[in-house]
Amino acid sequence: MTLIVTGAAGFIGSNLVKALNERGEQRIIAVDNLTRADKFKNLVDCEIDDYLDKTEFVERFRRGDFGKVRAIFHEGACSDTMETDGRYMMDNNFRYSREVLDVCLAQNIQFLYASSAATYGGSSRFVEEREVEQPLNVYGYSKFLFDQVIRRVLPTAKSQIAGFRYFNVYGPRETHKARMASVAFHNFNQFRAEGKVKLFGEYNGYAAGEQTRDFVSVEDVVKVNLFFFDNPDKSGIFNLGSGRAQPFNDIASTVVNTLRSLNNEPALSLAEQVQRGLIEYISFPDALRGKYQCFTQADQSKLRAAGYDAPFLSVQEGVDRYVRWLFGQV
């Protein structure tokens, strides 16, 4: 049977295509928008059955042009949290997703989709409950609104619907995201270009570089998606983060030490890195004051209750792997 991946040339989508290939799956229809043509590089080492532009996909999907479809991994979206064109964002992330969902429900196709931790916005709790969801931008709202649709249809759906609230994902195949790429990606490039990594200084009671995020490797994101793909009886909206908040200092320090290791230099403590000027703290920008999350951490209770029991990579493990991959691409 056929599998469909939307956003297939993007960060998470291309990692899913590659992982499906490694399982022997090649009857994959890749759907994307290659207006930004450089994304094609993410699919060069992947095997797909066909490629479709997103503008023609839904109508052909509705008509049944692809025969028997087992599942769709719906990763296609505008993920730029700085996008201010609300009409574009809602058409791309909400309306388009509803159309894909409607076809899946009508044809009993597994529907696994990308939600986002941006649905929580200014909340201090990160549990999949309506009362703690406070999106701060139109991107978060587009994901939040679609999740509300899912909550309404879940009780009567006859096929799987699984949504994943991605936290701060990092890993291979994100180069095309440019300024929206992960902190690890930018730290890697900054250190290679300038010989140091710059982090925000003290803010809102957090010491320099100690603001925290739930950083999750794309390796783990793919594993969770495939777990639900293999278990079509499990539905719901699930946080997809490591469940562990770690400071930006951990990212920067791991990037520095991994690059030092690749240069046959010994690892240094964070204090030594700061003392040597390898990590530098800059004043917290006035433009971000009052708009910046100093802490995120996925509550994994619902994910674990669904039966996913594999451990998640720590920043030290995942970023080390990622930096070595990036270094190999240079």
Curated annotation (Swiss-Prot):
This is ADP-L-glycero-D-manno-heptose-6-epimerase. GO terms for molecular function: ADP-glyceromanno-heptose 6-epimerase activity; NADP binding. It comes from the Bacteria. It comes from Paraburkholderia xenovorans (strain LB400). Signal peptide: none annotated. NADP(+) binds at residues 11-12, 32-33, 39, 54, 75-79, 92, 143, 169, 177. Pfam families: Epimerase (PF01370). It is an enzyme of class 5 (isomerase). Substrate binds at residues 168, 179, 186, 200-203, 213, 292. GO terms for biological process: ADP-L-glycero-beta-D-manno-heptose biosynthetic process; carbohydrate metabolic process. Contains a large N-terminal NADP-binding domain, and a smaller C-terminal substrate-binding domain. The active site is at residues 139, 177.
